[in-house]
């Protein structure tokens, strides 16, 4: 979902707590 986390996740992993790689390759708060 949104808002974005300011992180990209080309590897499929988000390192920011509470963020998911959706939609790839952008990390968003779930």
Swiss-Prot record:
<dbReference type="InterPro" id="IPR005535">
    <property type="entry name" value="Cyclotide"/>
</dbReference>
<keyword id="KW-1015">Disulfide bond</keyword>
<feature type="disulfide bond">
    <location>
        <begin position="5"/>
        <end position="19"/>
    </location>
</feature>
<dbReference type="InterPro" id="IPR012324">
    <property type="entry name" value="Cyclotide_moebius_CS"/>
</dbReference>
<comment type="function">
    <text>Probably participates in a plant defense mechanism. Has hemolytic activity.</text>
</comment>
<dbReference type="GO" id="GO:0006952">
    <property type="term" value="P:defense response"/>
</dbReference>
<dbReference type="GO" id="GO:0044179">
    <property type="term" value="P:hemolysis in another organism"/>
</dbReference>
<keyword id="KW-0354">Hemolysis</keyword>
<keyword id="KW-0611">Plant defense</keyword>
<feature type="cross-link" description="Cyclopeptide (Gly-Asn)">
    <location>
        <begin position="1"/>
        <end position="30"/>
    </location>
</feature>
<feature type="disulfide bond">
    <location>
        <begin position="14"/>
        <end position="27"/>
    </location>
</feature>
<dbReference type="Pfam" id="PF03784">
    <property type="entry name" value="Cyclotide"/>
</dbReference>
<dbReference type="InterPro" id="IPR036146">
    <property type="entry name" value="Cyclotide_sf"/>
</dbReference>
<protein>
    <recommendedName>
        <fullName>Leaf cyclotide 2</fullName>
    </recommendedName>
</protein>
<keyword id="KW-0204">Cytolysis</keyword>
<feature type="disulfide bond">
    <location>
        <begin position="9"/>
        <end position="21"/>
    </location>
</feature>
<keyword id="KW-0960">Knottin</keyword>
<comment type="similarity">
    <text>Belongs to the cyclotide family. Moebius subfamily.</text>
</comment>
